[in-house]
Amino acid sequence: MNNFLKHNDWARDPAFNHFWRHYDFSNQWIKQHTDASRQVQMQMVQRDNLSTEQCFSDSEEPEVIERLSRCEIYSEIENEESDIEEMSEEMKAFFAKTQEHRQKLKEQRAAEKRKEGQSSSKSQEEYVNVDKISIRGRIEQSTDHRNASAEFIAKREKAKKDYGESATKILAMESTLAMKFESEYSQNPQLWPNIPFRF
């Protein structure tokens, strides 16, 4: 395993630490499981005073044969040297590309955070009492020039996209409702409370 890490720089990247911890944990589990299986087998053999071959060849249980074959496989794996084959060029390119994408995404998120920080510091809103807020909401003072025709065109395009053919009807109903509100509001109605409290 150490040879593999020596020859592959990408594998030592901190992004893969979780993977290597999991890999080590899995190897430890396999070794412990193999040791426990061997101990159980040895106890069975000693108890019956038979060799392992006789013990398992006499039994006709397929489970026992399967367990023995698994234990042999684990012991073979354990006995072999832990030299892992070199990675193919495609795999190396894949990991390099993945790391590059992660780095770009990290930089993009950092830039967005910086941008949000700058915009929030610019637009520190002042506290406004409720009685100072008009019926149309809070009107913010801005030095930016408002392009009403561009806003109207954008609103119309959005309505076409959202409502399809009936977009013109819906925009007309919105305009009618806004005009009725303005005509009522121009008469200075009592806004609150609109019903008398008589207890």
Curated annotation (Swiss-Prot):
Annotated coiled-coil segments of the chain: 72-116
Pfam families named in the record: GEMIN8 (PF15348)
Basic and acidic residues bias (residue ranges): 98-117
Region (Disordered): 98-127
Keyword check for Cell cycle: no
Cellular component GO terms, alphabetical: SMN complex
Domain of life: Eukaryota
GO BP: any one term: spliceosomal snRNP assembly
Keyword presence, Repressor: no
Keyword line: Coiled coil
Annotated protein name in UniProt: Uncharacterized protein F10E9.5
